[in-house]
């Protein structure tokens, strides 16, 4: 059923989603949902529906837990080069060690050509070439002491480099293997 009648009006579910999420690129929370979807699809671990209050964003078939963070916004501060950072404050208890931490974290950044492109940004958001990501183990991230934000500089200090989203699965598998080898 895609139409419902309420208050004497015929409402369309698709129209609501178009209105609410028409530009997924405006807010990190919206782009975060898309990032979760893309990562889950790439890793073949999408649950039937998204659970907002689940302990972890995604759980792979082998039980590996993932936390997904995404941003489209570069921060600009006087005297600094533009940089990306991700808000992890809602996971601060996890990062402080007060509750189990996700096995791996995937930090994604998306950049969409704005005025130069005739392709709508919502369509660009589904194009893998517009995404890069960092993959880091939860334990390595916990040692960094971040409880509010994680920046690119933090990830690089931890020895993590960005990769195209298309290479994420390969990098995650290598990280998982090196974790098993320790």
Task: Report residues per predicted region.
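Nucleic-acid endonuclease domains
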Residues: 1-65, 69-182
């Amino acid at each position: 059923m895609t139409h419902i009648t309420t208050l004497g009006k015929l409402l369309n579910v698709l129209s609501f989603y178009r209105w609410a999420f028409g530009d997924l690129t405006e807010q990190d929370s919206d782009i975060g949902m898309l990032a979760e979807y893309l990562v889950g699809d790439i890793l073949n671990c999408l649950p039937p529906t998204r659970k907002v209050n689940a302990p972890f964003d995604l759980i792979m078939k082998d039980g590996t837990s993932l936390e997904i963070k995404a941003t489209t916004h570069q921060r600009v501060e006087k005297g600094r080069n533009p940089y990306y950072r991700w808000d992890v404050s809602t996971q601060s208890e996890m990062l402080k060690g007060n509750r189990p931490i996700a096995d791996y974290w995937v930090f994604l950044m998306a950049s969409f050509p704005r005025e130069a492109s005739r392709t709508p940004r919502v369509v660009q958001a589904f194009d893998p070439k517009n995404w890069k990501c960092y993959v880091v183990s939860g334990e390595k991230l916990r040692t960094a002491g971040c409880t509010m934000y994680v920046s690119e500089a933090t990830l690089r200090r931890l020895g993590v480099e960005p990769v195209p989203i298309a290479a994420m699965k390969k990098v995650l598998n290598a990280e998982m293997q090196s974790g098993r080898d320790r």
